[in-house]
Amino acid sequence: MPELKVSAIKEGTVIDHIPAGKGLKVIEILGLSKLSNGGSVLLAMNVPSKKLGRKDIVKVEGKFLSEEEVNKIALVAPTATVNIIRNYKVVEKFKVEVPEVIEGILKCGNPNCITNYEYVTTKFYVISKNPLKVRCHYCERTMEEEEILANL
């Protein structure tokens, strides 16, 4: 397999094993195009992968992800792995996992849901992880992957 030539980062996060074509969505939902710390963001798309065939990789310099951000990644790229980098070394590595309950990340697709016109934190229960399907706590609307991605 040909070698992938991408420079290492000193401090930050590498999001690996993103399904091919989903890297831009990961950058978008994490707001990485608006980094205020001056760190760089690198997106490698459609690179060879033994596990996935093809994958995307996102490297973020100078940023460490919160639990909420990791949960957002799980909704878009459930196969992703997050690597925490300090002094050019991986100090922590974990797979993202879709939580059983999703709070405050997702908007409900039902225009009549109370969360769309009152100041109420959204809450969804995961019905299925593959394919991804969630149900709103308030109006009980069920949303599938395409609608979930549109409402992140």
Curated annotation (Swiss-Prot):
Keyword Acyltransferase: no
Pfam families: PyrI, PyrI_C
Keyword field contains Zinc: yes
Binding site for Zn(2+): 108, 113, 136, 139
Source organism, top-level taxon: Archaea
InterPro entries documented for this protein: Asp_carbamoyltransf_reg_N (IPR020545), Asp_carbamoylTrfase_reg (IPR002801), Asp_carbamoyltrfase_reg_C (IPR020542), Asp_carbatrfase_reg_C_sf (IPR036792), Asp_carbatrfase_reg_N_sf (IPR036793)
GO cellular component: aspartate carbamoyltransferase complex
MF terms (GO), sorted A to Z: metal ion binding
Keywords: Metal-binding, Pyrimidine biosynthesis, Zinc
Cofactor(s) the record lists: Zn(2+)
Cofactor detail note: Binds 1 zinc ion per subunit.
GO biological process, one term: 'de novo' pyrimidine nucleobase biosynthetic process
Quaternary organization: Contains catalytic and regulatory chains.
Role this protein plays: Involved in allosteric regulation of aspartate carbamoyltransferase.
Family: Belongs to the PyrI family.
UniProt protein name: Aspartate carbamoyltransferase regulatory chain
Organism: Pyrococcus horikoshii (strain ATCC 700860 / DSM 12428 / JCM 9974 / NBRC 100139 / OT-3)
Underlying gene: pyrI
